[in-house]
């Protein structure tokens, strides 16, 4: 098991926009984040991932949510609309398209609201131009990406390929294994993204249907508590003021003045966005108890995975151990920032590192191969795509084939 990290209470800068202990208009009490995340007693609830998204938004003091329906996030977007009808959000409306939604989210964030939206698959790709714009504008918007197939022929089923496209947008990227992860990541994601030394958008990702439409037991804090709201005055860049825009780039591109100014501006700002991702590490480690979880990493064979591939790997490991094959596990929680040093340390003894994924590109295996010494140890796969499940028996069979072990005919 992992060693619990120290959690000094002054590590995270919280909003001082409201006084803790006071109530919002819905009667929820603004609660210290350390108390809400680590101290209050939680009660079990049995619900789908979409319902979990609703519950998280209900206590997150979200100001604006913009929606556009696309499976498998449509239900979550509709449930957030119910929260608006009940009075928990200040603004909620449906955009004209996924591209429009992300632009409208930017406007709300420029105006100082905490902003949450959801998307999936082709919607993510249609909205893609906005994500690096969010990052470059230092907008701490949260988008919940309920990942699904993006290829033709059309598939609405789970596939994590869209995460590959998001890797270089400048956003934080956290990948939830379970509905519990998803709930916690949504709430903690706001806090990390809004830190003054970070202040960039975050994609909280989960595997569509496997998480969004499957019921699971989730431990929830009391619904009469809520996070302190976003404090736009903690932003490292000026808030948007429609009477006095903070910078002329909104109306007058740098390239109109000088190519050199344009080049140097973009180069330095891209470096700053990436530096902000790196600065998020200390806050993320504090709130998520590390960027990875590890189990039995002293073994010669290790599986490294993220999302629901972790769940399938756990059962595959159990089956392998019944045959006397001992395998360790590394669960990756954050894709950006990527846990470079943690993975190198966790896999340093391994002779074989398997990376099962719900996509054919093998983007996670590529990330791992790029950082570990002797990367011939990294075996990309097994892979499934387009909504195929990844049975634990398939993981077992493919691992045994690679290791030159006998494969049972009934597998």
For each feature predicted by the language model, list its residue ranges:
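Glycine-/acidic-rich phosphate or pyrophosphate-binding loops and their flanking alpha/beta elements
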Residues: 48-53, 278-301, 314, 318
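Peripheral docking tails and interdomain loops at the edges
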Residues: 356-411
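Thiamine diphosphate
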Residues: 8-179, 187, 207, 376, ...
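Short gly/pro/ser/thr-enriched loop/turn and capping motifs at secondary-structure boundaries
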Residues: 123-126, 148-152, 181-182, 210-212, ...
């Amino acid at each position: 098991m992992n060693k619990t990290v120290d959690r000094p209470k002054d590590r995270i800068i919280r909003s001082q926009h409201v006084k803790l202990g006071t109530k919002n208009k819905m009667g929820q009490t603004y609660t210290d984040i350390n108390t809400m995340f680590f101290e209050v007693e939680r009660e079990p609830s049995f619900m789908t991932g979409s319902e979990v998204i609703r519950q998280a938004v209900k206590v997150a003091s979200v100001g604006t949510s913009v929606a556009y329906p696309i499976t498998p996030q449509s239900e979550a977007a509709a449930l957030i609309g119910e929260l608006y009808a009940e009075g928990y959000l200040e603004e909620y409306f449906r955009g004209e398209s996924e591209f429009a939604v992300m632009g409208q989210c930017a406007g709300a964030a420029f105006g100082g609201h905490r902003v949450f939206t959801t998307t999936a698959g082709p919607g993510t790709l249609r909205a893609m131009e906005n994500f690096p714009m969010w990052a470059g504008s230092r907008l701490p918007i949260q988008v919940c990406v309920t990942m699904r197939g993006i290829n033709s022929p059309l598939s609405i089923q789970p596939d994590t390929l869209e995460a590959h496209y998001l890797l270089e947008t400048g956003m934080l990227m956290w990948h939830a294994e379970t509905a519990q992860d998803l709930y916690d990541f949504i709430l903690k994601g706001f806090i990390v993204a809004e830190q003054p030394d970070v202040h960039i958008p975050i994609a909280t990702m989960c595997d569509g249907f496997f998480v969004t439409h499957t019921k699971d037991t989730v431990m929830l804090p009391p619904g009469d508590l809520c996070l302190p709201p976003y404090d736009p005055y903690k932003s490292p860049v000026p808030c948007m003021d429609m009477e006095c825009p903070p910078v002329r780039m909104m109306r007058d591109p740098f390239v109109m003045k000088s190519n050199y100014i344009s080049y140097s501006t973009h180069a330095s700002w891209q470096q700053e966005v990436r530096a902000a991702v790196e600065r998020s590490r200390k806050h993320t480690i504090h709130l998520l108890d590390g960027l990875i979880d590890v189990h039995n990493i002293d073994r010669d064979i290790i599986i490294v995975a993220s999302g629901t591939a972790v769940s399938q790997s756990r059962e595959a490991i159990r089956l392998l151990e019944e045959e006397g094959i001992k395998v360790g596990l590394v669960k990756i929680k954050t894709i950006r920032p990527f846990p470079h040093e943690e993975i190198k340390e966790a896999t340093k003894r391994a002779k074989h590192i398997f990376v099962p994924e719900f996509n054919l590109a093998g983007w996670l295996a590529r990330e791992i191969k790029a950082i570990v010494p002797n990367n011939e140890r990294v075996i990309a796969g097994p892979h499934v795509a387009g909504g195929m499940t990844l049975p634990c028996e398939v993981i077992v069979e493919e691992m045994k084939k690679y290791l030159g072990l006998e494969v049972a005919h009934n597998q």
